[in-house]
Amino acid sequence: MGGVRAGNLYGTLEMLILRGLELSGPMHGVGVADHISSRSGGLFQVEEGSLYPALHRLQAKGHVAWEWVKTEEGKRAKYYEITRSGRRAVAQELKGWISSTRAMLSLLDLSAEEVR
């Protein structure tokens, strides 16, 4: 099965970013993309052209904050962190996804165990 670009999954990229930051803590942009790829078993690939505009939208909404951090290699990297507002937003999004997933499983006559 081929990969899916997370930016092509309309309306999901921001939720995936927020959830990744919530689960793993502050990360730089490449770390966010790697987290999404790793957690999806490589199925979702986030390109820079989708990732950074999404991070900027999340920052504009107050869901993400950032700071410059000096890396082990001595370079500066922008690290993103989920805010309290971002935590509330991702909690709301997750409720919707859980509801939609249950409905899809029912429509497809599948159990949660069958899709694990």
List PLM regions with ranges.
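Basic amphipathic alpha-helical segments that dock to polyanions
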Residues: 51-58
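Basic, amphipathic "hinge/linker" alpha-helix immediately C-terminal to the N-terminal HTH DNA-binding motif
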Residues: 75-94
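A positively charged, amphipathic N-terminal helix/segment that binds anionic biomolecules
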Residues: 1-2, 80
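N-terminal helix-turn-helix DNA-binding core of bacterial DNA-binding proteins
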Residues: 6-50
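Beta-hairpin "wing" of winged helix-turn-helix
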Residues: 59-76, 81
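Amphipathic alpha-helical dimerization/coiled-coil segments
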Residues: 88-116
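Short beta-strand/turn micro-motifs at beta-sheet edges
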Residues: 3-7, 68-69
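Amphipathic alpha-helical recognition patches that constitute DNA-binding helices
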Residues: 12, 16, 77, 81, ...
